[in-house]
Amino acid sequence: MKILIADDNIQKQRVLRTCIEENFGSSDITQTFSFTTTIKALTSSVKFDIILLDMTMPNYDSKEPMNNDGKMRTLAGQDVITKMAYRGITTPTIIVTQFEVFGRHSSLKPISEIAQELIASYPNIVKGYVLFDLQSELWKTDLIKKITEL
């Protein structure tokens, strides 16, 4: 199974990778840490079976040359999904986020609502979301179930 984990949090990536390896055996896992490197991975010749996608990532990896826009992109995951649809990439994608709400002040929106909108708009791509929490094991059960159902 070829899996792309797109997340800027190294610890979260490590925990996700361990969860996959423990429950699905050895997998070919590619890791990206920004919006740009995620798009590059998706448009490369590699075809992934599953994408685990964080919702908030920087525009560029901090190690990329000419990185003068490493600002956080609050809805990077949503933007990745939109680009996937535009390019005809329909790899099953599970959003894995630590945040329950996105936005600012009066424009706050819960991840459950964002995910439902994405599932409705891109049903061939978005297969749900998992609320990641290092203090709990519930996210693992949810993620394993969602991957198994694919």
Curated annotation (Swiss-Prot):
SUPFAM superfamilies: CheY-like
Post-translational modification as stated in the protein's UniProt record: Probably phosphorylated by DtcA.
GO biological process: defense response to virus; phosphorelay signal transduction system
Domain Response regulatory: 2-150
Residue list for modification 4-aspartylphosphate: D54
Keywords: Antiviral defense, Phosphoprotein, Two-component regulatory system
Domain comment, as recorded: Consists solely of a response regulatory domain.
Function, in words: Possible phosphate scavenger member of the two-component regulatory system Detocs that confers resistance to bacteriophage. When the system (DtcA-DtcB-DtcC) is expressed in a susceptible E.coli (strain MG1655) it confers resistance to bacteriophages T2, T4, T5, T7, SECphi4, SECphi6 and SECphi27; the level of resistance varies, resistance to T2, T7 and SECphi4 is not very high.
Protein name: Detocs response regulatory protein DtcB
Organism annotation: Enterobacter cloacae (strain JD6301)
Source species taxonomy: Bacteria, Pseudomonadati, Pseudomonadota, Gammaproteobacteria, Enterobacterales
This protein's encoding gene: dtcB
